[in-house]
């Protein structure tokens, strides 16, 4: 069994599979992904594989520079997105946007 390259909370699985979530915002520990990378995706909770994605773009961002477009790509409101990122990465301000598509 191959290991997963990246994981998402289970609550995001349906949005990823339906194409409603097309970016993920990560901290420095996951800043190594590059455009063109093909990644096996698993659920954070049980590491169960659920799809393969291709990275289509990467960029850096701060909490203060998040926009409505980022929120739309995450399938949530900007207020929700800022709260989710702050809850997952407390005290951090520099992040990495990974844009992707399901294969």
Swiss-Prot record:
Transmembrane segments annotated in the record for this chain: none
InterPro entries from the UniProt entry: AC4CH, ASCH_domain, PUA-like_sf
HAMAP family listed in its UniProt record: ac4C_amidohydr
Domain (ASCH) ranges: 6-101
Family per similarity comment: Belongs to the N(4)-acetylcytidine amidohydrolase family.
Name of the protein this chain belongs to: N(4)-acetylcytidine amidohydrolase
CDD domains to which the protein is assigned, alphabetical: ASCH_yqfb_like
Function statement: Catalyzes the hydrolysis of N(4)-acetylcytidine (ac4C).
SMART domains documented for this protein: ASCH
Enzyme class name: hydrolase
Record keywords: Hydrolase
Pfam family name, one: ASCH
UniProt GO molecular function: hydrolase activity, acting on carbon-nitrogen (but not peptide) bonds, in linear amidines; N4-acetylcytidine amidohydrolase activity
Active site (record annotation): 21, 24, 74
Reactions mediated catalytically: N(4)-acetylcytidine + H2O = cytidine + acetate + H(+); N(4)-acetyl-2'-deoxycytidine + H2O = 2'-deoxycytidine + acetate + H(+); N(4)-acetylcytosine + H2O = cytosine + acetate + H(+)
E.C. code: 3.5.1.135
Lineage: Bacteria, Pseudomonadati, Pseudomonadota, Gammaproteobacteria, Enterobacterales
GO CC, one annotated term: cytosol
UniProt organism field: Escherichia coli (strain SE11)
